[in-house]
Structures are given as structure tokens and as C-alpha cells.
Amino acid sequence: GSTLSPHIWRFNERIRLHGKEASDEEICDAFEAIDSARGDVTLTYFEFSALAALYCIAKEHMDVAILEIGLGGRLDAFNAIDPDIAVITSIGLDHQAFLGETREAIGAEKAGILRSRQHVVLGQEMPASVMQRCEALSLQPRCWGAEFSSVCDIEQGTWQLTRQGHSMYEIPLTAIAPHNIALAC
């Protein structure tokens, strides 16, 4: 299963089960279960959305779930999950009103998803705040450019993920944006 945010046309785009969007029925069932279980607890839209995704994925007994952290990381609803692998693809100046004014501040927020004894994959040009968090947790991240990279072939419409000079995967360019190549790891 997987999640993404934001959706473009309809909420169902946020939750994928077995490679397909969750159905209206699956999502409504999830919302009903969450609403009845929450009691007097108030949930934000994002918390409700994250719980719905987790409910749907758990109900399908998925072996693997790829959960896209939405806003930031440290305070994101999905950060309640203790993942085996954490991926930070890039740090830009987004959501500055919530995450901070600089790449360092935003990096510190995004690095809030990192846990000890975890595999970590990092995109290009990580701010020192991310690397410091890795060091504080004794993590050894796989870094874009050092451990892996890619080669785009526009004519063939593919990109190849390479590790130590050896091609690992060839993926259609339409499957993933080239600047998010770290997601494939």
C-alpha cells in the first residue's frame, strides 16, 4: 500500500492498495471506523486522512507500506509510525510559515522522521541539520551522489538507478519525476 499528498482530483488518490486507488467504500469504512473509535478526541483533516490510510492498508494485510510524509516530518501524523526505512528526497523552502525560514530549520523538521536503528536514504545537498540528526542517532545514510545516482535517457524515456556504477533498475520516466529519484531506493 502507499499514500501520497495532496490529491489532485479526489481523495481516493491519497491511498493505493495493491497498486490501485482505494475505493469509495473502503475509504468510507475507514472513516466510519475512525469516527466511532475516536470518542471525544478531535482529529485534524491530516490526522483523519493518515488514520484512514493506515486503516485501509492494515485491513489489506500489506507486507509493505510507503507512507509519504505531508507537511514537514516531526509533527506529521504519519510520524507516529516507526518505519524500517526513512527517505528524505530534498529540502526546499516550502511551508516556511510552519517549518521555518531556512533550509536548516526545514531540514531539522523533516529530520524529525528519523529513528535510531533505521535505514536512511537522503537526496542531494542535505542541510547540516539533517546530517547532524543522522549523526546523533548513529545512522549511516545512503546519500544521492555518493552511494547511488541515475542516468536519464530521454530518447528511450527511461532512467536507470545506478549504485557503485552498476545499473540496478530501469524505470519509465513517466513513472516518477527525475528530481524525486531517491524515492525509488
Which residues does each PLM region occupy?
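Inter-motif core of Ras-like GTPase G domains
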Residues: N79-S90
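Adenine nucleotide phosphate-binding catalytic loops in nucleotide-utilizing enzymes
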Residues: E21-L43, L93-G107, A111, Q118-C185
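Conserved beta-strand scaffold positions in the cores of enzyme catalytic domains, especially
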Residues: G1-S2, A86, P141-C143
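ATP-dependent carboxylate-amine ligase catalytic core
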Residues: S2-I81, A97-L99, A105, A128
